Amino acid sequence: MNPIFALPQADWNSLMPEIVLTGVASLILLLEAFAPRLRPVFNGMALAGVAAAAAILAQQPAGLYFHGLIESTALTGAFSQTILLATAIGLLSAQGYLKRERLLFGEYPALLLWCATGLLLLVRGVELVTIFVALELLSVALYGLAAFHRREAVSSEAAIKYFLMGALVSSCVLYGAALVYGETGSTSLAGIAAALAAGTGSPGLL
């Protein structure tokens, strides 16, 4: 059996907030493509997804999941709920602007939900590769949001500049993670801390 599917149910439950947000975002994009007449309800769908993710997070027990890739604590729970609250505020506060600019498309709530997904993984990730993947998910969604106003040249310009800066920063983060792994032999934050505390490698280089 594939080891991914052999994971305990608790591991999958720990990712349920991200799964819910990703599922709702994907559904909104499908409806945008095949049933655009439903655009008025997309924002409500996104808010329902955020509320569901918040409810799941509130009931999530503390612990390490996915072989130590993700951690749930009271602190990560508080940050995650703050992220979801900010996402809900972003969905509600943008409605007037989107209507005024005639930009009520499904991509906006979908991209915002993917931003929230990346942020949740970033908050709860305790391993360098997980953190990097979360950062990239967040960045790709933000590139789309930066270019969302298709009729404005400044929006496209901002997206291009952000993409170039994001590519540079991603390269630096990945290179730094490779150096840390080379010095400590671990991508886990706990393993890195233990290696540095033991005095192995060259902490000054890091």
Spans of model-derived segments:
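Alpha-helical transmembrane segments of multi-pass membrane proteins predominantly involved
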Residues: M1-L206
